Amino acid sequence: MMRAWESRPDCSVVDEPFYACYLKETGADHPMREQILASQSTSREAVAKRLSAAAMTDLQYEKHMTHHMPRGIDLAWTRNIKHVFLIRSPERVIASYREKMPSVSPDDIGIIRQRELFDEITELTGQRPPVVDSADVLANPKAMMREICAALCVEWVDGCMTDWKQGARPSDGVWAAHWYGSVKASSGFSAASVTPAKLSAQDLALAEEMRPHYAAMATCKLPRP
């Protein structure tokens, strides 16, 4: 999704700006921890202030991870921002996380927190944000990206949001070296996988635990009736 928005001539992107804050606050032992802490501010107030400042482009797309946004933080700065929530089946989320990390917990994948944030943003803004399922985007990228633009009242720009040049971007977080192999190799949205994710019994149980939260958000997904 970040590549799709950055391919627009009128849009810049910000990659996980609260990652260093999350690492400092939790002490989480993530790959490239020290490099991430050195690359970003660890002050939530400073990050929010920067994100609230005027952008260099007409549009600014921010990619946030729900586990970077813990319970109790001040979200007032997001009141006038347009939000979109991207959901993915619990099995796919867990399988993707397991490719890079030795263990996984509910807090690691952030599905419960995503549902909480959806409710918090709805209350804060007075509007229910659009929800997008990654499987729907991969099944029909152009149609779904059009839906997202329409929901955000953003003009569709033909020929750029579904295709892009391969390679790294200056906007990529320093953690891209560990996490973004497939992203850097991509030149567009990949085809949706039809092969079920292979999970251990323990991870399957976690997926079932997360399913009600995923299903609740899926009732709000685009395209809306």
Residue ranges and their predicted role:
Residues 1-20, 145-165:
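Internal hydrophobic scaffold segments of catalytic domains
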Residues 59:
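Short, Asp-centered acidic motifs that coordinate Mg2+ and/or phosphate
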Residues 1-56:
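PAPS-dependent sulfotransferase catalytic core
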